[in-house]
């Protein structure tokens, strides 16, 4: 934790923020292009919409503070603009129930979709059209290289061999790679989400409440709310008190966005975060590569990361 924390602090300056933001932005734009190409060929149904996004701020200072980053992103073709409270409410009428709002940043090209439904649909395409075999429940305990092959052993004793291995195991990647003398600076930051029926005044545009660090995302006839960031919490089990905190914060932010009395499902996940907040996508040698450390942007960066990871694994870069 201490080593990771010191590395994180070394990035905590304006130069580091700009460098890391642009690195992540480039990957996000690659992901958008890759997703568009995939959906043209395979129209997977996952509540996908180009709904736009509003980053909301409780003070005018916060809104103006985002201006420099907007100008920087504009050079990469990203469409964003500053909006005051009235303009934000005109874009998303559901914000009429947010008296704390001072203004925000509007990104009209932002997309939304259900990652679970997408993953199910993509797996079906891969199996039916490309002959991919999925092996679930293989809890990998160790990874070693012998006789020109990678040997994987599961906790139940099963074994696999492979010529190439791509490690995408989130926070568990560090434990798998450490015996190979490969240290990965990845920290677990636990986040929560819940999904509920739409409320009486649910937003259509995706909403980020920067004051409470919450995200509201409409998925068809449901709405998903995500937030919280519990540093160095390696327990994947949801804690009822923390989930209750998330629900209370969502109520305070947008009280009519969801039917908070009828939560359909809740979830907690361990976000694998690097000190510089962008992922590690690297060829590690001998047919081994890694694709880890996406933090809270795993869904945003997934497609571009996958393309880069395959290139690294096959030695194309």
Which positions does each model-derived feature cover?
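Rossmann-like flavin
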Residues: 2-121
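Surface-exposed helix-capping loop/turn segments at secondary-structure junctions
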Residues: 37-48, 128-133, 182, 254-261, ...
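C-terminal catalytic lobe of FAD-dependent flavoproteins
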Residues: 80, 210-211, 251-317
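A conserved short coil-to-beta-strand element within the FAD-binding core of flavoproteins
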Residues: 83-92, 111, 131-150
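Flavin (primarily FAD) cofactor-binding/catalytic cores of flavoenzymes
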Residues: 102-104, 108-124, 138, 177-180, ...
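A structural signal for short hydrophobic beta-strand segments in well-ordered beta-sheet cores
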Residues: 142-143, 214-217, 281
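Central helical "cap/lid" subdomain
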Residues: 152-203, 239, 256
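Flavin-binding catalytic cores
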Residues: 176-179, 183, 199-202, 220-224, ...
């Amino acid at each position: 934790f201490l080593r990771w924390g010191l590395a994180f602090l070394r990035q905590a300056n304006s130069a580091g923020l700009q460098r890391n933001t642009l690195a992540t932005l480039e990957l996000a734009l690659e992901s958008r292009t890759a997703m568009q190409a995939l959906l043209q060929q395979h129209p997977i149904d996952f509540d996908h919409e180009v709904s736009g996004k509003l980053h909301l701020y409780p003070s005018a200072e916060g809104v103006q503070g985002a201006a420099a980053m907007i100008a920087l992103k504009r050079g990469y073709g990203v469409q964003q603009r500053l909006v005051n409270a009235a303009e934000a409410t005109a874009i998303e009428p559901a914000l009429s129930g947010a008296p704390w709002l001072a203004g925000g940043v509007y990104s009209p090209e932002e997309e939304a979709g259900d990652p679970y439904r997408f993953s199910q649909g993509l797996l079906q395409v891969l199996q039916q059209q490309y002959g991919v075999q999925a092996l679930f429940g293989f809890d990998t305990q160790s990874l070693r290289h012998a006789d020109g092959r990678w040997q994987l052993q599961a906790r139940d004793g099963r074994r696999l061999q492979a010529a190439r291995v791509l490690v995408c195991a989130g926070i568990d990647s560090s434990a798998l790679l450490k015996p190979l003398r490969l240290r990965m600076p990845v920290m677990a930051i636990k986040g929560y989400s819940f999904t509920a029926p739409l409320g009486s005044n649910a937003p259509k545009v995706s909403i980020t409440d920067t004051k409470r660090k919450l995200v509201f995302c409409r998925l068809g006839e449901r709405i998903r709310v995500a937030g919280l960031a519990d540093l160095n919490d390696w327990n994947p089990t949801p804690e009822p008190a923390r989930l209750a905190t998330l629900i209370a914060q969502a109520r305070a932010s947008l009280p009519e966005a969801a039917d908070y009395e009828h939560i359909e499902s809740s979830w907690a996940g361990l976000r694998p975060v690097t000190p510089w907040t962008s992922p590690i996508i690297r060829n590690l040698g001998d047919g081994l590569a890694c694709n880890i450390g996406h933090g809270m942007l795993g869904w945003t960066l997934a497609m571009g990361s996958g393309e880069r990871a395959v290139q690294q694994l096959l030695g194309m870069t």
